[in-house]
Amino acid sequence: MWFSRKQVVKPPPDGSRAQPGQVTTKSRGDAAESAAQVFLARAGLIPVESNYRTPGRGGGEIDLVMRTPDGTLVFVEVRQRSGASHGGAAASISPAKQQRIIFAARHYLMRFASPPPCRFDVVLVHGGPGQGPVENGRLEWLPAAFDAS
């Protein structure tokens, strides 16, 4: 009887587990956020920050912070779903998710002596695997999709 040694494959130094050329959920999400930022910039919004995170555990994240020409800060949540089997991208923004975004926005606004007006927009990216959000033009922008009240 012979025994083979178990091979241990170490993850790449960047911490990802993806193989070269493999499309991951994170890479699809990053592409969706980039496409949304370009889309909103073409619509006249000015990029301020991306992937803003509150410090510590249990906080929130804001995908994009944009500014309108009149100075309103726009906190943007980008959601991508390949299908509508569970309600699509819009259905994935639960009240709990909205509260985490609002928490992060309040934290972000603490840097201002006098906070500017703000709103919460959503950009939905529709499309399945292999369907890039930019090429097929399936972005849906929902200005003032929810509020902090």
From Swiss-Prot:
NCBIfam families: PRK12497.1-3 (NF009150), YraN family protein (TIGR00252). HAMAP family: UPF0102. It comes from the Bacteria. Residues 1-30 are annotated as: Disordered. GO terms for molecular function: nucleic acid binding. SUPFAM superfamilies: Restriction endonuclease-like. It holds the Pfam family UPF0102. InterPro entries: Restrct_endonuc-II-like, tRNA_endonuc-like_dom_sf, UPF0102_YraN-like. Belongs to the UPF0102 family. CDD domains: PoNe_Nuclease (cd20736). PANTHER family: UPF0102 PROTEIN YRAN (PTHR34039:SF1). This is UPF0102 protein Bpro_0391.
